[in-house]
C-alpha cells in the first residue's frame, strides 16, 4: 500500500496521458470511418448581421426611461448618503492623502479622438504617500508578530 502512496502523482499523470491517448485514437478512427463513407463536413459560418457593427447596451433598470434619471452631482460635492445633516465632516486619517488635479496637462490626441478636459483620470498623486508607507510596520514584521501570538 505504501507503493501507491509514494507514486500517486506519477500514476495519476500516466493515467491522464493514457486516457487522453485512448480518446484521441477513438476520435481519429471515427473521423476516418466517416470520411471513408463519403460524408463532407462543412465549417459553420457565423450568421450575417446585415453589415451593421452596432453594439447593443442593456441597462438593469426596472420601469424607468433615460429621461427620468437624475442629473449627476457636481464634482466637488460629497456623496449625499455619506454624511447625515447633523454630522460635521471628518478629517481624513493618516492613511489617506489629498489628490491634486493637474490643470496644465498635455493631452495627445490619437487619430482625432479627444478626451474631455475635466475627466477623472487627470489627477496627480502627491509624493507624501511614500513617507507614510515607510512609517508603517512592514508586512513581514507584522506577520511574525501574528504568529508569535498563537
UniProtKB/Swiss-Prot annotation:
The keyword Aminoacyl-tRNA synthetase does not apply. It is a single-pass membrane protein; Lipid-anchor. Residues 93-150 are annotated as: Interaction with TLR4. The chain crosses the membrane at residues 8-28. Residues 63-94, 110-136 are annotated as: Disordered. Induction: Induced in bone marrow-derived macrophages by CSF2 and particulate beta-glucan. Changing residue 97 to A: No effect on interaction with TLR4. The keyword Phosphoprotein applies. Expressed in peripheral blood leukocytes (PBLs) (at protein level). Expressed in dendritic cells, splenocytes and B cells (at protein level). Strongly expressed in the spleen and lymph nodes and weakly in other tissues of the immune system, including bone marrow, peripheral blood leukocytes (PBLs) and thymus. Not detected in the majority of nonimmune tissues, with the exception of lung. Expressed in antigen-presenting cells. Expressed in macrophages. Phosphorylated by the Src-family protein tyrosine kinases LYN and SRC. Phosphorylation occurs on tyrosine residues upon MHC-II stimulation. Phosphorylation also occurs on tyrosine residues after activation of CLEC7A/DECTIN1 by particulate beta-glucan. Lipopolysaccharide (LPS) induces phosphorylation of Tyr-58, Tyr-96 and Tyr-120 differentially to allow temporal recruitment of effector proteins GRB2, CSK and BLNK. Phosphorylation of Tyr-58 is immediately induced by LPS stimulation and allows GRB2 to bind. Palmitoylated. Pfam families: SCIMP. Changing residue 99 to A: No effect on interaction with TLR4. Interacts with CD37, CD53 and CD81. Interacts (via proline-rich region) with LYN (via SH3 domain). Interacts with CSK (via SH2 domain); this interaction is dependent on phosphorylation of Tyr-96. Interacts with BLNK (via SH2 domain); this interaction is dependent on phosphorylation of Tyr-120. Interacts with GRB2 (via SH2 domain); this interaction may be dependent on phosphorylation of Tyr-58. Interacts with TLR4; this interaction occurs upon lipopolysaccharide activation of TLR4 and is enhanced by phosphorylation of Tyr-96 by LYN. This is SLP adapter and CSK-interacting membrane protein. The gene is Scimp.
Amino acid at each position: 500500500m505504501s507503493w501507491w502512496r509514494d507514486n500517486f502523482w506519477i500514476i495519476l499523470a500516466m493515467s491522464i496521458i493514457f486516457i487522453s491517448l485512448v480518446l484521441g485514437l477513438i476520435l481519429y478512427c471515427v473521423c476516418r470511418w466517416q470520411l471513408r463513407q463519403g460524408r463532407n463536413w462543412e465549417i459553420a459560418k457565423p450568421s450575417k448581421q446585415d453589415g451593421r457593427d452596432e453594439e447593443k447596451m442593456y441597462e438593469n433598470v426596472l420601469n424607468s426611461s433615460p429621461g427620468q434619471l437624475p442629473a449627476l452631482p457636481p464634482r466637488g460635492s460629497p456623496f449625499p448618503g455619506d454624511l447625515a445633516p447633523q454630522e460635521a465632516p471628518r478629517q481624513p486619517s493618516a492613511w489617506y492623502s489629498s489628490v491634486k488635479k493637474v490643470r496644465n496637462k498635455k493631452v495627445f490626441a490619437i487619430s482625432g479622438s479627444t478626451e474631455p478636459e475635466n475627466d477623472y483620470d487627470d489627477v496627480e498623486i502627491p509624493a507624501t504617500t511614500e513617507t507614510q508607507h515607510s512609517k508603517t510596520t512592514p508586512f513581514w514584521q507584522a506577520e511574525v508578530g501574528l504568529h508569535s501570538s498563537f
